[in-house]
Amino acid sequence: MKLRPLHDRVIVKRLEQETKTASGIVIPDNAAEKPDQGEVLAVGPGKRNDKGDFVALNVAVGDRVLFGKYSGQTVKVDGDELLVMREEDLFAVVGK
């Protein structure tokens, strides 16, 4: 199934978090925090500003982004957990 977000929404897939610390301790799944980084899989067309002009989003497919632990709405698509969130819920784009 393919998702096409509407308006100023983006589809993000969480990046897997390390399950082992630098000292070699393995962190069990139930003790690990949700990762707060992800990859943008799809972006909506944008939204209209107060003047009625159309404004495109500042993120693009493939961008690595930071967001809050509880940001967005989780949806399952073909067995993958994805997040649907507004662009304003993103904190930053991580540089390459």
Swiss-Prot record:
GO biological process: chaperone cofactor-dependent protein refolding
Subcellular location: Cytoplasm
InterPro entries (UniProt xref): Chaperonin_GroES, Chaperonin_GroES_sf, Chaprnonin_Cpn10_CS, GroES-like_sf
Listed CDD domains: cpn10 (cd00320)
Keywords recorded for this protein, A-Z: Chaperone, Cytoplasm
SUPFAM superfamilies in alphabetical order: GroES-like
Gene Ontology MF: a single term: protein-folding chaperone binding
PROSITE patterns for this protein: CHAPERONINS_CPN10 (PS00681)
GO cellular component: cytoplasm
Oligomeric and partner information: Heptamer of 7 subunits arranged in a ring. Interacts with the chaperonin GroEL.
Family recorded in the similarity comment: Belongs to the GroES chaperonin family.
Job description of the protein: Together with the chaperonin GroEL, plays an essential role in assisting protein folding. The GroEL-GroES system forms a nano-cage that allows encapsulation of the non-native substrate proteins and provides a physical environment optimized to promote and accelerate protein folding. GroES binds to the apical surface of the GroEL ring, thereby capping the opening of the GroEL channel.
Protein name per its UniProtKB record: Co-chaperonin GroES
Taxon lineage: Bacteria, Pseudomonadati, Pseudomonadota, Betaproteobacteria, Burkholderiales
